[in-house]
Amino acid sequence: MFKTEYHFEVKKRDWLLVVRLFGEIDHHGAVTLREDLDRLILKERPRRLVLDLSLIEFMDSAGLGLLMGRYRLMQDIGGVMVLSRPNQRIMKILRLSGMERFMEIEGVGAKGEQEDEAR
């Protein structure tokens, strides 16, 4: 696990890379997070990158830029990026930005709603 103003956990299986992000994605930590994610992506070269947003509490325009840049990087290396489990607040930001029209997003909903659906 890497730690700065944010932190994340990484799980890798074959050509799948799952990155679970915690906390906030804002202008304070976006540059360092971007650098760490880019290093990880270029080292592992996954075919599928899943960014688990279920524990993201806040995201601003720097966070949107971070997501867009990783989306493009994955396209450049021939892979795909999926956003997983954004809460309702983060999903609203993704909708307003237009990202939901071209990014694959799975498991939308508040954490409590997702747990209820799993039962």
Task: Annotate each language-model stretch with its function.
Residues 59:
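Conserved TIR/SEFIR loop-to-helix hotspot centered on a Trp-containing motif
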Residues 1-56, 72-119:
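STAS-like cytosolic regulatory interaction modules
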